[in-house]
Regions:
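Active-site environment of divalent metal-dependent phosphoester hydrolases
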Residues: 10-14, 38-43, 61-67, 90-96, ...
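Short, conserved loop/helix-junction motifs that constitute active-site signature segments
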Residues: 47-51, 100-104, 122-123
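Pre-active-site segment of Zn-dependent metallo-hydrolases
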Residues: 13-24, 85-103
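N-terminal active-site segment of His-dependent metallophosphoesterases
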Residues: 1-52, 62-71, 80, 141-143
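Helix-adjacent hinge/juxtasegments
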Residues: 51-94, 105
Length: 166
């Protein structure tokens, strides 16, 4: 099972559209995961129309229209792994322990908010993934997103994709 992970698209404030390399990944993914801060409903409509399956949440910059359509936290069993998606996890210091306590029973937690890519494993095995932002690099050298796979109940092939400058 192929996964495409993104967050913090902030359209149209940070870019006019999603980057072409990211959009090219959408039809190849079995599941597209978006960890919030869409800002406009057009991006949600676009990904709902192009994705085989969309697992998504709203973020702190999303208005009432997006909050009405998306949960604060989403859960799914994907290929034998229990996934959670949330926008904000708090400060980097102590994140692993805090998330492991808040989300017991998960194998993978996808989050956003910081626009800073993150890939760590908490004590007890919870994998924490932040794909960064494909449209707003915020103190990072590149805009980013992640791809990954689930194979025989294992998360594999986690790759951070760095987008060329706009």
């Amino acid at each position: 099972m192929r996964l495409l992970l993104m967050s913090d698209t902030h359209l149209p404030k940070r870019a006019k559209a999603l980057p072409a390399p990211l959009l090219d990944e959408v039809p190849r993914a079995d599941v597209v995961i978006h960890a919030g801060d869409w800002v406009d409903t057009a991006t949600l409509d676009l990904l709902e129309g192009r994705s085989r399956r969309l697992l998504a949440v709203h973020g702190n910059n999303d208005g009432a229209d997006l909050r009405a359509r998306l949960p604060e936290v989403a859960y799914a069993d994907l290929g034998g792994l229990r996934f959670g998606v949330v926008h904000e996890t708090g400060p980097a210091q102590g994140r692993e322990a805090r998330c492991a306590a808040r989300f017991p029973g998960l194998d993978v937690l996808v989050f956003g908010h910081s626009h800073i890519p993150w890939d760590t494993t908490a004590p007890g095995g919870l994998r924490l993934l932040n794909p960064g932002s494909p449209t707003d690099r915020r103190r990072q050298p590149h805009c980013t997103y992640l791809t990954a796979a689930v194979d025989d109940g294992r998360l594999t092939d986690v790759v951070l994709h760095r987008l060329p400058p706009r």
